[in-house]
Amino acid sequence: HQLRNAAVALTTIDVLRQRGWHIDESAVRQGLAQAAWPGRFQVVRRQPTIILDGGHNPQCMVSLAAAIREYLPGQPVTVLTGVLADKDYGKMYDQLAPLAARFITVTPHNPRALDAGELAAFLRRYGKPVTACDTIREGVSRMLADTPPDGTAVCCGSLYLLGDVVQSLEKV
């Protein structure tokens, strides 16, 4: 996503320059260097490495899976996840399952959320260990217990999940 967004920004700058706007090259470089999209492959902790990604549809999971393959090649990844029931979660997890060592499911705080137990039952089809947790805090504790200090965990599936994960990480 970030590369596509940068390409759109650069194209916009080119169009504005063609229309007479003066946009300093150093400002463009600084803007690109400082650009960040919280909740998109965002590293929030080390030992173990914890990555947040708010991807909540199949296209976002394609991007997340590509980032995992690029930046964590061959590494087993613990996946803490929760999803809204009205999302196409079958196609979402088809992208992620080949890269997951294990899944930990939680229920996001949203009336449309899929129950962690239902999601766990669905994810078992991929043949990976799956643990359903009653609370997000319990899921974060389980994720930290299941991920070695030199390992990586990815928290994904819903933007509604990420804030609660960050709060739970601060408390454990």
Where are these regions (language model features)?
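Nucleotide phosphate-binding/pyrophosphate-handling subdomain across enzymes
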Residues: 1-102
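Active-site-proximal loop/hinge segments that shape catalytic or ion-binding/gating pockets
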Residues: 158
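C-terminal helical cap/extension that packs against the catalytic core
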Residues: 49-51, 58, 93-152
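Short, active-site-adjacent cap segments at secondary-structure transitions
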Residues: 161-163
